[in-house]
Design a protein with these regions (language model features):
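Conserved, well-structured interaction surfaces
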Residues: 79-146, 175-183, 192-203, 439-444
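Elongated scaffold/linker segments in the mid-to-C-terminal portions of large proteins
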Residues: 255-453, 460-462, 520-573
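"A position-specific structural signal for the A-helix of alpha-solenoid helical repeats
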Residues: 126, 133, 140, 216, ...
């Protein structure tokens, strides 16, 4: 049985065991090495093709484990484990994340191993693309399956390093166990540096490039830069250095505020801020994709999509921190440009309500929407039992009020009634939809310039260069919030302000949960939703990492060590 599973592992988890298995035709290794220019385009398209399937679970395991979204209720779908933190090794979405990632690594590695460098700038560039994809995938793997870098990286395990098809794949195959977190990071760095060296041709954001490698290196080194309280200044400086290369290249520019509010609608070719994305096109995006793709869970657009996940109350509160964003169609006012990616589903009759979040018990919060009447300065609302309440103004201009409800004072807003899914108002998320105005078409963003400024801001702060950090932080903040820049930044507030801006800016790009834990912070999800609202997930929790898929362990030709199954197995130092 183990022999059968080993062959299955070779064929599935490490696809491309020989070149005939690669997409786009059957080509022998001899044909490719003798005339690489005739075949490389098709072969590399095969590498990029793996990313299209891989990027779906990549998004879900990165975003759903954070605090930017909530779901309408419990679900039998495997992704609910990401939300609930009920980790199991038998999860088909994590299996796809693993399988298609290793397929991409295997195909990229086989091309690297077959083609000699130095034949032409075009061939070297294509080899660089392969190195980029491999390095990027190893990094995405190690942050999902490995502990945060500041936690004993030479002891904790990353992922297996398998660069190409082993010689004896159909014989007595043996592969080494998982490399350490540090070794996996070094593999990613070496690949990305090689990619940076080889790539000299920029084919646009849908393809790997020198800048894409530099952008990813800025993030990798940032992940290695320790916490704000105990920074690793060597890696923080390297994060600055690689961010400088991207920013100073002049090849990318931040979109204007007006255009940034439409960021999701631009194709990669028409977006000056995008550095590398996993390109999707309408012709390959079926009706099925509009429901089961990432955007389909966040919204129903034109009758397409489930629309069962919404912006969390915590994220909405962050958006409203500097002034209320009013989404009502006849009073539309966006204070924070990031609020343009949120679309409440207002009821057609535009019934005025007072909406607030009330505490139902010590551990459960929920939304309330009470019918409201505004008569000059006098505002009242009525609950479902017919009890009337007079509201106290906090800001009449922004229509923010307080209510004394069941002996507790709550703050809320006058708004139109938002349609409910079960008991939750539908704050649809459109950041992963509407590319080219095509319903839920979306090319997942891997790197864009906005992130690079924030990478550099954080790295500067960890180096104690707070003036430089403030400049970068405000570059991003003031793009979204006119006049919203901070006056000062120092050791007392840098971590909180920079992390808050990363949350606002990079929401729904699969970054949030990793950002929280890599800086040693807890994840607090005290907001309405079916998750355990009272549970604070610490950075030391064993559930910070995902389990290695059990099928991968069963099929692995050698020992493949599982992650800890409780906190007693976690190594912190």
């Amino acid at each position: 049985m183990k022999k059968i599973l080993t062959i299955a592992f070779a064929a599935a988890a490490l696809t491309a065991c020989d070149i005939e298995r690669l997409p786009y035709g059957s080509m022998s290794a001899e044909q490719i090495t003798n005339d690489p220019s005739a075949s490389l385009d098709a072969l590399i398209n095969g590498v990029y093709a793996q990313l299209k399937t891989w990027s779906d679970p990549m998004h879900r395991c990165g975003e759903y484990a954070g605090d930017n979204m909530m779901i309408r209720g419990s679900s039998t779908d495997a992704f609910f484990e990401f939300i609930s933190y009920s980790r199991t090794p038998n999860n088909y979405r994590l299996q796809n994340f693993w399988d298609y990632g290793y397929k991409g690594i295997a195909q990229a590695s086989n091309i690297i191993n077959m083609i000699e460098e130095g034949q032409s700038a075009e061939i070297d560039n294509q080899l660089g693309e392969c190195y980029y994809v491999r390095g990027m995938l190893y990094f995405y793997f190690v942050r999902a399956y490995g502990r945060p870098y500041y936690q004993a990286p030479n002891k904790n395990l990353g992922v297996p390093i398998v660069n190409g098809t082993p010689e004896n794949v159909m014989g007595d195959l043996f592969l080494e166990d998982r490399a350490t977190v540090h070794e996996t990071y070094m593999q990613a760095i070496n690949d990305l540096k090689k990619a940076e060296q080889l790539m000299t041709i920029d084919k646009g954001a849908a393809y790997a490039s020198k800048a894409a490698a530099q952008a990813m290196l800025s993030r990798v080194y940032l992940y290695m830069s320790g916490t704000y309280e105990n920074p690793n200044t060597e890696y923080a400086q390297l994060a600055v250095d690689y961010a400088n290369k991207v920013i100073n290249s002049g090849n990318y520019s931040l979109l204007s505020r007006e255009n940034f509010m439409k960021y999701n609608t631009f194709t990669p070719e028409n977006n000056d801020e995008s550095i590398f994305v996993v390109k999707r096109v309408a012709s390959e995006f079926s009706g099925y994709d509009h429901y089961y793709g990432v955007g389909g869970m966040y919204a129903n657009i034109g009758g397409m999509g489930w629309g069962e996940m919404f912006a969390s109350a915590k994220y909405i509160e962050l958006l409203n921190e500097t002034g209320r964003n009013d989404w009502r169609p006849d009073n539309y006012k966006i204070v924070d440009a990031r609020a343009a990616f949120i679309e409440p589903t207002y009821r057609a009759d535009h019934q005025l309500v007072f909406r607030f979040i009330k505490r139902d018990s010590e551990t459960v919060e929920n939304y309330a929407q009470f019918d409201a009447v505004k008569n000059g300065a006098n505002v009242t609302c009525t609950d479902a039992e017919g009890t009337s309440y007079t509201l106290t103004a906090v800001s009449e201009e922004e229509e923010i009020y307080t209510i004394n409800y069941n002996g507790v004072t709550y703050e809320g807003v006058l708004d139109y009634f938002i349609n409910l899914n079960r008991v939750y108002p539908q704050f649809y998320i459109t950041k992963c939809s509407r590319e080219g105005e095509d319903s839920h078409l979306h090319s997942p963003v891997i790197s864009r310039l906005g992130e690079i400024y924030l990478n550099r801001a954080e790295a500067y702060a960890k180096l104690g260069q707070y003036a430089n950090a403030l400049t970068d932080l405000n570059t991003i903040r003031e793009r979204s919030i006119v006049g919203g820049g901070y006056a000062s930044l120092d050791a007392s507030n840098a971590g909180d302000l920079i992390d808050k801006e990363r949350q606002l800016e990079l929401a729904y790009q699969a970054e949030r949960s990793y950002d929280v834990f890599r800086n040693g912070k807890p994840l607090d999800r005290t907001f309405p939703g079916p998750h355990n609202q009272a549970e604070i997930v610490e950075a030391s929790d064993y559930r910070v990492t995902y389990y290695i898929p059990q099928n991968a362990i069963n099929a692995y030709p050698g020992t493949l060590t599982q992650n800890p199954t409780d906190n007693s197995g976690v190594i912190l130092n």
